[in-house]
Amino acid sequence: MRRIAVVGAAGRMGKTLIEAVQQAPGAGLTAAIDRPDSTLVGADAGELAALGRIGVPLSGDLAKVADEFDVLIDFTHPSVTLKNLAFCRKAGKAMIIGTTGFSAEEKQRLEEAGKDIPIVFAANFSVGVNLCLKLLDTAARVLGDEVDIEITEAHHRHKVDAPSGTALRMGEVVANALGRDLEKVAVYGREGQTGARDRQTIGFATLRAGDIVGDHTVLFAADGERVEITHKASSRMTFAKGAVRAAMWLDGKAPGLYDMQDVLGLH
């Protein structure tokens, strides 16, 4: 059995991950971790996820359950994930990282850790989104410099980073296909007298409202026609199942920084 731990286990995504792990053949939740000051420490992780008792108590200390798992799934916050990364690197534990909002320097730390442990890091673990990334690469290469490119995304009111990691990853894929540097061509929102649009730019627009799980659209607009590639998620379980799939795939893999495209064989 693949022994899986979930950090941030008392949160919305954490509970969904617990359910996904318990549903996956050959996988089992053997550790669940949350903040040390959480009032839920000691509670049964299965009961927190409304699955019934599974005999795995919520821990407030990752080090105390280090012997209980093979791979850690982390969908938390960059500061938390980096601390967990340092621990897992030292302990020789594999990681699945779905946290977004990392700086360029922080991403470099993930790459460094990948020299010692196997890691799957992805902005989005949905199979559908990763298929879209493949399609975006093809679309950008075919349409080339003859279109204007805009990326729109919408998420729930609680999401703290913008644009989403998925939107940025989509922008990276498109920019790379066109030989552009996203940092130089990205335009984040527009207001006032912006002047005519520069076709070399890639625009981003963000919406935050209600309980939207995640909507992403990349628009390729030419004179006379438009192509849109859209993905809409209706449940966090989509991401959770992908993360568990990655955790199973990582079993026996050599140290390295992998992504969901590797897991799905899309590279």
Swiss-Prot record:
Residues annotated as the enzyme's active site: H155 (proton donor/acceptor), K159 (proton donor)
Gene3D superfamilies named among the record's database cross-references: Dihydrodipicolinate Reductase, domain 2, NAD(P)-binding Rossmann-like Domain
Annotated binding of (S)-2,3,4,5-tetrahydrodipicolinate, by residue: H156, G165, T166
Binding site for NADP(+): R35
Compartment annotation: Cytoplasm
Keywords: Amino-acid biosynthesis, Cytoplasm, Diaminopimelate biosynthesis, Lysine biosynthesis, NAD, NADP, Oxidoreductase
Recorded family membership: Belongs to the DapB family.
Function, as annotated: Catalyzes the conversion of 4-hydroxy-tetrahydrodipicolinate (HTPA) to tetrahydrodipicolinate.
Entry protein name: 4-hydroxy-tetrahydrodipicolinate reductase
Organism: Pseudomonas syringae pv. syringae (strain B728a)
Gene: dapB
